Amino acid sequence: TLSVAATILQSNGQLFPKAAAFLILAHGLNKMTEYKKIFKCLTENDTKKLACCFSNVAQKGDIFALYGTLGAGKSTFSRFFIQNLSDAQEVPSPTFTLVQSYEGNDFEIYHYDMYRLKSPEEAYELGIEESFYNGVNLIEWPEKIGYLLPKNIWTVNIFTKDSARYFEVTVSDEEKKERLEKLGYGD
């Protein structure tokens, strides 16, 4: 059974006031609990602030699975995230290289674009398994790697509505939930 533990909505009918609404979904006693937080970005600068907040709480071993349609903002979010953690000025989308790596202050940062993969097995050739343990991973089009994607990750669904960009972030453990709650965006 799925029960909504908490939902915050603005009283004038607008969903997700200012920056975030917190939604906790409990999937029963024997199942993993998911925690969701939704962030609203009106400008590219808002997206930059949000990406920087996430990069500030990122830890070695974190995987950010970035879902969204073409043009949703996956590469833009990734660029700001990477620039905040490294000296990289230019952060091109890895559309053709499939992966770009960057030396961060405390760990390596891997930026994947899986759009062109034909099967999950092709991700092995990119060294994806090693990167899961050796750094922070930003994965665009994670649905292309299917079963290779670990369970305990940051799931980021990006979508647009009424000229705003929304980032729906889901985590499934207490430690990530604490980091999500301390993010500092829109507080």
Q: Which residues are covered by each model-predicted region?
A:
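N-terminal pre-Walker A segment at the start of P-loop NTPase domains
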Residues: 33-51
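Conserved lysine of the Walker
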Residues: 74
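P-loop (Walker A) phosphate-binding loop of NTP-binding proteins
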Residues: 69
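Short beta-strand-centered segment that lines the nucleotide-binding/catalytic pocket of NTP-utilizing
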Residues: 87-102
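Conserved nucleotide-sensing/catalytic segment adjacent to the nucleotide-binding pocket
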Residues: 102-140
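Short phosphate-coordinating micro-motif centered on Lys-Gly-acidic
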Residues: 37, 129-187
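Hydrophobic anchor at the beta1->P-loop junction of P-loop NTPases
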Residues: 64-66
